[in-house]
A protein has these predicted regions:
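Flexible, acidic/Gly-rich N-terminal and inter-domain linker regions that tether
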Residues: 1-85
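Short pre-active-site segment immediately N-terminal to redox-active cysteine/selenocysteine motifs
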Residues: 97-101
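Conserved Radical SAM active-site core
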Residues: 56, 68-93, 103-130
Length: 130
C-alpha cells in the first residue's frame, strides 16, 4: 500500500541523491512531510517553483532568522496544549501532524523533535475552558 504521507526525501523520486544529501542537515532538524498531490503540483524543472519552495526543505532554513515562536504564543498558553489569546476563542494543540509541513510555518517549532507543546491529554485544557 502506498503511504498517505511522505515523511522522508528518500520517498520523493524527483529529488536526486546529491540534493537529498545536501538537505539532510535541514531534515535532521526540521521535519519533512508532504503528499503525492502537493508533489504533483511542482514543476521540477524550476528550482524556484513556488510549490517546491513551499514544500521541499531549503538550506536557508538553517540560517539564523528569528524566533521559533514569532507570534509569542507562549504568552497565551493557559494549560498544556491550550492557547487563549482572544476573549471568545481558545485553541487546543492536540496533534503534531499536518498535511504538509510548509517550510515557512510559524508553528514550525511544534514539529521539531522533542517539542512538548502538543498535548494528547486534553483534560487540563478542557478544565480551563469550563
Amino acid at each position: 500500500m502506498k503511504p498517505k504521507y511522505l515523511v522522508s526525501l528518500e520517498q520523493v523520486a524527483n529529488i536526486d541523491a546529491k540534493e537529498r544529501a545536501e538537505l539532510k542537515r535541514v531534515t535532521d532538524l526540521f521535519a519533512f512531510r508532504s503528499n503525492d498531490y502537493y508533489l504533483s503540483l511542482i514543476n521540477w524543472e524550476d528550482l524556484k517553483d513556488p510549490i517546491r519552495r513551499l514544500i521541499i526543505p531549503n538550506p536557508g532554513e538553517l540560517e539564523p532568522w528569528g524566533h521559533l515562536d514569532p507570534s509569542s504564543e507562549h504568552r497565551y498558553t493557559r494549560a498544556p496544549g491550550l492557547q487563549h489569546k482572544y476573549r471568545e476563542t481558545a485553541l487546543m494543540l492536540v496533534s503534531d501532524a499536518c498535511g504538509g509541513l510548509c517550510r515557512y510555518c510559524f508553528r514550525k517549532r511544534l514539529f521539531i523533535k522533542d517539542a512538548r507543546e502538543v498535548n494528547k491529554d486534553v483534560s487540563k485544557g478542557l478544565d480551563y475552558i469550563r
